[in-house]
C-alpha cells in the first residue's frame, strides 16, 4: 500500500494541479498590468464623490441662508407683534376709555347744555326782565321786546373778536407748555438737583427805562395765559427833563413769546402813561382775556361813606388792551358801591385776575358786622396766651383793636354796562399782615387762591380758597391752623416767634402756579452766604415736598422791595423778579429787573 505522500503525488500527476506552480507564476506576471477600463471607473468614482461633496456644500449654504432669512422674518414678526401690543395697551385702551368717557359722560352733558342753550334763546323772544346779550348777531336785528344798551357795544364786541383772532396764534405757542409739571417724578430713586439761570429782559419797556438811568419803583407784575401786565412808578432823571413831574405812573401789557431756544420773551405791545396830578400813587393790577385792569388811589386807606355825611373819594380805573389804540384803553374815576357795614378798605400791592370779563382783587376791609365774631375767635384762642399774636395791641392795617376782614373788589369790564366797582366782604382766617393780598386763578370753578405774604420772618404767609361767585367765602387751605381752645370757624396763621431771622432781609409775595394741583413759590433776600442771594422756595403741599435754589448776586445792599411773578414754560419754572436795594458801597438806590429759570431734575 502506498504511503500518503505517494498517493497525493500520484493524484496530482494526473491533474492540472501538477502544473499549479507554473500557473501561479503566469498569473502574477499578468497582474502587474491593470486594464485601462479600471482606471476609467476609478476616475468616474472620484468625480462622483467630488460632485456629491459640492452638492452637499451648496445645499448646506442654502439651508444656512434660509435659516438666517427665517430668523430675520421671525424677528420682524415679533417686533410687529410687540408694536401691535403697544398700540393696543398704550394707545387704543386709553383711547377707548376716552371715547367711553366722551360718550357716557360728556356727550349727555353737552346735549343738556345744548338743550339749555336752545331753551334760553327761545325764552329771549318773550322776556320778562331786562336782558344783557353778548352775541354779535343781536346787534344786527334785536327783538323789539329786548332792551340792551347798544352804546358802542356792537363796535366793541367786533373789535374784541378781531383782537382775539389776531392774538390766538401767539397765545397757542406760548400755552403749549404752560401747564406741565415742574417737579421730577414722584418716585425719584436718586438725588434731586436744580439748575438756575438769569436772563435779561431785552425788549421790555421797563428795562429800556431802567437802562436810561431812570429809576423804577414799586413794580407790580401779573402773568396769565401767555399775557403779562405791569404797572410801576417811573422817576425820571433830573438831567433829561422829559417829564413835568417827579413820578410817572406807567402801565404796560404784552405777549410772552417764544424766542431763541424756545425761551420766553416778554414783548411789550401796548402801554399807557397817566397824566400828572392823577390819583395813581398806589395801584393794583389784574390781567386776563387780553386786557389789563388797575385800580389806583392816592392814599392806601379808602374811607367808605354811605350817606351825605362825607364826600366819597373816587377810585381811578385804568383798562388797557393788548394792542394799541383800542376801546379797551380807558381811564375813568368811579365811586365804589359797598355794603353799609363796611367802613374802610386798604389798597396796596394787589395782584388779581380777569375772568368772564370781570376783574377781581382781594383787599383788607374793615366791617363792623364781623368784628364781634373775629374778636370771639381771638378771645377763645388766647385763653392760655400761648400764641404770640395774643399780645398784640394793634392790628394791621387799620390800627388799634380793629380786626380786618376780607374784602373783594369786582369790576365788570363788559362794554354793555357802565363801569362800577362793587365791594363785598366776608370773615376768614385772622389777618396778621395787612400789606398786600394777591388773588390767583384756580382750575376749580368759581374760586381762586388768595395769598397773604409773610412778614419780618416771624409771620408766615397763608393761602386761602376764596370764592368768585355770588357767595363770597374765604376758607383756609395752607399755612393756617385751628387753635384747640376755639370752636367753630376760627383759624389763625402760623406765627413762628417774635425773633426775626437776621439773615433774611426781606421776603417776597407768595405766588401760586397755574398747575392742576396747587404749587406755590416764595423768594427771600438772604445774606447768610458770602455773597448775597435771592433764594427761591418751591412747595408742593399735597406731596409735602419742597425745593430751594439760590441765585447769587454780584452786588450787596439793603433791599426795600422784592416782588416776583412765576409761570411754567416747557416744564421749567420761570419767574419775573424785581427788587430794589440800597448799595453798601455807592450809597445809591438801584432797581433790578430780570427773568430767572429753575430746572429740577432727578439723578437716577
Swiss-Prot record:
Effect upon mutating residue 552 to A: Partial loss of fusion activity
Residue intervals annotated with topology Intravirion: 1-37
Glycosylated sites: 149, 422, 587
Domain of life, source organism: Viruses
Membrane topology type: Single-pass type II membrane protein
Residues spanning the membrane: 38-58
A GO term, aspect molecular function: host cell surface receptor binding
Any single Gene Ontology cellular-component annotation: host cell plasma membrane
Effect annotated for changing residue 527 to A: Partial loss of fusion activity
Keyword tags: Glycoprotein, Hemagglutinin, Host cell membrane, Host membrane, Host-virus interaction, Membrane, Signal-anchor, Transmembrane, Transmembrane helix, Viral attachment to host cell, Viral envelope protein, Virion, Virus entry into host cell
Documented effect of changing residue 547 to A: No effect on fusion activity
Entry keyword Glycoprotein: yes
Effect in UniProt of substituting residue 489 to A: No effect on fusion activity
The protein, known as: Hemagglutinin glycoprotein
Gene that this polypeptide is encoded by: H
